[in-house]
Curated annotation (Swiss-Prot):
Gene coding for it: Xpr1
Catalytic reaction list: phosphate(in) = phosphate(out)
Domain EXS stretches: 439-643
Record-given protein name: Solute carrier family 53 member 1
Domain comment (free text): The SPX domain plays a role in the regulation of phosphate flux. Inositol hexakisphosphate (Ins6P) is bound between two SPX domains of the homodimer. The SPX domain has high affinity for inositol polyphosphates and its affinity for inorganic phosphate is two to three orders of magnitude lower.
Spans annotated as Important for inositol polyphosphate binding: 158-165
Subcellular location: Cell membrane
Described purpose of this protein according to its UniProt entry: Inorganic ion transporter that mediates phosphate ion export across plasma membrane. Plays a major role in phosphate homeostasis, preventing intracellular phosphate accumulation and possible calcium phosphate precipitation, ultimately preserving calcium signaling. Binds inositol hexakisphosphate (Ins6P) and similar inositol polyphosphates, such as 5-diphospho-inositol pentakisphosphate (5-InsP7), which are important intracellular signaling molecules involved in regulation of phosphate flux.
Amino acid sequence: MKFAEHLSAHITPEWRKQYTQYEAFKDMLYSAQDQAPSVEVTDEDTVKRYFAKFEEKFFQTCEKELAKINTFYSEKLAEAQRRFATLQNELQSSLDVQKESSGVTTLRQRRKPVFHLSHEERVQHRNIKDLKLAFSEFYLSLILLQNYQNLNFTGFRKILKKHDKILETSRGADWRVIHVEVAPFYTCKKINQLISETEAVVTNELEDGDRQKAMKRLRVPPLGAAQPAPAWTTFRVGLFCGIFIGLNITLGFAAVFKLETDRTVWPLIRIYRGGFLLIEFLFLLGINTYGWRQAGVNHVLIFELNPRNNLSHQHLFEIAGFLGILWCLSLLACFFAPISIIPIYVYPLALYGFMVFFLINPTKTFYYKSRFWLLKLLFRVFTAPFHKVGFADFWLADQLNSLSVILMDLEYMICFYSFELKWDESKGLLPNDPQEPEFCHKYSYGVRAIVQCIPAWLRFIQCLRRYRDTRRAFPHLVNAGKYSTTFFTVTFAALYSTHKEQNHSDTVVFFYLWVFFCIISSCYTLIWDLKMDWGLFDKNAGENTFLREEIVYPQKAYYYCAIIEDVILRFAWTIQISITATTFKPHVGDIIATVFAPLEVFRRFVWNFFRLENEHLDNCGEFRAVRDISVAPLNADDQTLLEQMMDQEDGVRNRQKNRSWKYNQSISLRRPRLASQSKARDTKVLIEDTDDEANT
């Protein structure tokens, strides 16, 4: 692998600009070589002066890069030392509390199930769990910084070696010895000490001296491009997708020959439409994940996932394919119910019952950690006023806004099975009384309108909670206003629908109000999409016209196409209103909803790419590469104490009590190395040391 590719694959995306600009140096060298005057047409002194002038400029650029790297490394190292001191302080506090409450001086307390613990013990258990997670994330940040150190040194060595080869000199090697090999970022070994200290703390204080267990917790995933999925996962993805495509073709033929009347067709469509949208969403989310990884958008950090264990795009494709097969088989079974002994109404219940069980399955199988993460996130979304709102919380609520048809179809299914289904008819999903008009998919009783407003309500209260936490009217109250327009749109749509059915004279008034609020809502959301969520139309965009100063995806055309797509689909309701207002044929609204619901899921899929890109660029601006997890917040006095601590000989002091560590193995930054640390640590990221210039 060429070093440029290796560097690109292994850098920390949020620190991209802080690495040595290896490609720029290469371009300088090749450009100087191409533009050099020929000895055949000019004298040798002119050639020497040309290269001397170039070398002066080249080494000045090297000095600037070296200063940049030294500064960034020093800042990150100081930040790591402060963070380590904070974690030490929090660990000491937890140990002191435990000692006072139970008389146990270490974490080797008797093992009891969490549900048997007292309230104080539960709090302590949570603190220890948070500390383990915090040390794990901190360890990852140390490895990233060590990787930064190694990559930059190798980059300087490679480019200076190339300089000497092209210019046929040894001044590059001399410059490296004089400047790079004595640079603070290379000579400073405190990062290795911090790594050893962290391993010792986690092993001795958090894992009862079990080093194997500690290192398993601290294990850092391979730094670089996404690792290939296991062969069996790839096989299952191909198998499931192939079967799903084949079953869809079969469904198409079966639908032509098996469906008979509208009374049979539309209950099936409404019940199975939501399942299809969910499968489409999972598949497109897999494409999102693949695109983020390829472009270097760190979605793992943005969603605050566990970097050591999370779903890849192949896993999402596998889940979508598997559920897609079940969906097709269930629908096919409904088509062939007349020749089956199982009543038709059993198949939808079995399908969605399995989906629910798959999600809440308590056994540690079938992506248990990812499912548990999703369940916790759903709980936080539906209890938004009572929790601080993070990115993953409002991202998921935004997805629910595009999946509102699923909630409406779920409401329809519950209503249909409860009030309309003719249970003694096993061959078709028929209403109990064919003479009575269907009411479950209408707004007559207001329940459907309420269900349709639930996703917008969740985002609305999330915005209010964020305003409460930050006291910033912009953007949070303004964003809440955006979601409030949905309430008016749905309300007047429901009033128009019910008044139209009853031939009221004021129907046209509600129609115009519906159209008015649709226009307001679409313009509001479109502007917010482009300007706030995507960060486009930046006045400092420079050559990226109508975009922003920095873009991640390689082609500008992606952004322009996304803008056009967002405008079209944000105003797709105009087609729906035009058709429903000018025709009185039954089920026209259902047909349009069935067509436009997948398009809305696709619009959200495109939105996801640029929303996460914008969040990623914010992280890059803050050089935030790992989660910042803390057990106890620091007040101003604590922060001052931690800053002063770095110059004290006795290390960290407890912030509740003015005392030092009293354990045999002090974990002060200045303590002697442990005997167990004399062994070489297998934590460094390997840098390919290829001297073959063809590979550089």
